[in-house]
Amino acid sequence: MAAQDCPVRPPVIAPATGGVDAPIVNVAPVQKILDVCRAMSLWPMTFGLACCAIEMMAVGMARFDISRFGAEVFRPSPRQSDLMIVAGTVTRKMAPALVRLYEQMPAPRYVMALGNCAISGGPFNFEGQYAIVEGVDNLVPVDVYVPGCPPRPEALLEGLFQIQHKITGRRWWPVPAEISGSMGGGA
């Protein structure tokens, strides 16, 4: 029997009532589970350009242990990452590489600007300078800003918590007392 002789059954789909295509499956609960899984298993890509990269390395050590909060392995490849941590001064010569790496990351992707240099150019941002990008947000969309020169490892962890909050819509870890006072009472 040839392939053209086989009867093809039309798909059995019930027409939607009211002229609106009703969803077949409610994926909202599944999406919530996926968001929690995504938030608790972020794979950061380090883009350490200056002093702040040292603090980023400290977060991976035993005292702070970023793996407790779901960001265990710093990935060397943008195709394996969903969080880019830009730490340090971004020069105009480095800007195209940063944008290219961001574009190679799979969606959804998140960016954290770590330190004053990544946020605004830091002490290198002065009148007449030509080599420094005045904030990484001029190149790629930034989700969380972590200020400091350099920021403490605890601040980087708080930035990670903010990204997790952005993904899931809820706070998973308590706000430390020294941070909650500066945030206006806690989350």
From Swiss-Prot:
Keywords: 4Fe-4S, Cell inner membrane, Cell membrane, Iron, Iron-sulfur, Membrane, Metal-binding, NAD, Quinone, Translocase, Transport, Ubiquinone. It is found in: Cell inner membrane. GO terms for molecular function: 4 iron, 4 sulfur cluster binding; iron ion binding; NADH dehydrogenase (ubiquinone) activity; NADH:ubiquinone reductase (non-electrogenic) activity; quinone binding. Signal peptide: none annotated. It is a peripheral membrane protein. InterPro entries: NADH_UbQ_OxRdtase-like_20kDa, NADH_UQ_OxRdtase_20Kd_su. It catalyses: a quinone + NADH + 5 H(+)(in) = a quinol + NAD(+) + 4 H(+)(out). Its main location: membrane. Its cofactor is [4Fe-4S] cluster. GO terms for biological process: aerobic respiration; electron transport coupled proton transport. [4Fe-4S] cluster binds at residues 51-52, 117, 149. GO terms for cellular component: plasma membrane; respiratory chain complex I. Its EC number is 7.1.1.-. Binds 1 [4Fe-4S] cluster. NCBIfam families: nuoB_fam, PRK06411.1. NDH-1 is composed of 14 different subunits. Subunits NuoB, C, D, E, F, and G constitute the peripheral sector of the complex. NDH-1 shuttles electrons from NADH, via FMN and iron-sulfur (Fe-S) centers, to quinones in the respiratory chain. The immediate electron acceptor for the enzyme in this species is believed to be ubiquinone. Couples the redox reaction to proton translocation (for every two electrons transferred, four hydrogen ions are translocated across the cytoplasmic membrane), and thus conserves the redox energy in a proton gradient. PANTHER family: NADH DEHYDROGENASE, NADH-QUINONE OXIDOREDUCTASE SUBUNIT B 2. Belongs to the complex I 20 kDa subunit family. This is NADH-quinone oxidoreductase subunit B. It comes from Nitratidesulfovibrio vulgaris (strain DSM 19637 / Miyazaki F).
